[in-house]
Amino acid sequence: MSLFNTVRKTIVPVHKEGYPFVAAFFVASLILGWIFKPLFWIGMIFTLWCAYFFRDPERVTPQDDDLVISPADGKVSAIQMVTPPAELDLGSEPMLRISVFMNVFNCHVNRAPMRGRIVSINYRSGSFVNAELDKASEDNERNGLVIETRHGQIGVVQIAGLVARRILCWANPNEPVDAGERFGLIRFGSRLDVFLPAGAAPRVSLGQVAIAGETVIAEFASTKGPIISRRS
């Protein structure tokens, strides 16, 4: 194995959405270093920190249509039955909601929790209160996806927070999506809510750390065989 391949496999890649920020910090480091040499190294610390914020590591996703995979890195902050947001058009019956809160140190890339077809994408403007608060689901700026799966329609909602005020989503309606596939990003943390229909049982507990594209957060009843995985 060449040195280049070794380095490439060791260094976690940076998502392209982070390139402008990393470049800006690097240029600022050069300017500061020209003014006063030690400032260059201080600037480089912030440059590396920014690259870390926008890291986009590969994940090994279980390939089982009965499993619901975490859409975000972070801490499970809520597991409850609630009425889904009206803009998702998922009805008025309570659904299982599992929330994952991302802090500024978590990976910001969001991934699809199940395989299916994207039915709709709905953006709603709002406020920017602390995303850990329950009212953030109703009050904060958010972007919701509805995905048609073998178990019915599910909702995935990106929620802005106190620090994170930029939601990105590059998915499109009527597109197929795989479990663990990247579909969006929230700059500098926040929260993801997953809304699941009847038949889904949680497989995580409050406060548990979840990994996007890998951690099973819920499961639908099944009698199928062994689970395989796919890198994404």
Curated annotation (Swiss-Prot):
This is Phosphatidylserine decarboxylase proenzyme. It is found in: Cell membrane. The modification Pyruvic acid (Ser) is found at residue 190. Its cofactor is pyruvate. Binds 1 pyruvoyl group covalently per subunit. One of its GO terms (molecular function) is phosphatidylserine decarboxylase activity. Pathway: Phospholipid metabolism; phosphatidylethanolamine biosynthesis; phosphatidylethanolamine from CDP-diacylglycerol: step 2/2. Keywords: Cell membrane, Decarboxylase, Lipid biosynthesis, Lipid metabolism, Lyase, Membrane, Phospholipid biosynthesis, Phospholipid metabolism, Pyruvate, Zymogen. The gene is psd. It holds the Pfam family PS_Dcarbxylase. Catalyzes the formation of phosphatidylethanolamine (PtdEtn) from phosphatidylserine (PtdSer).
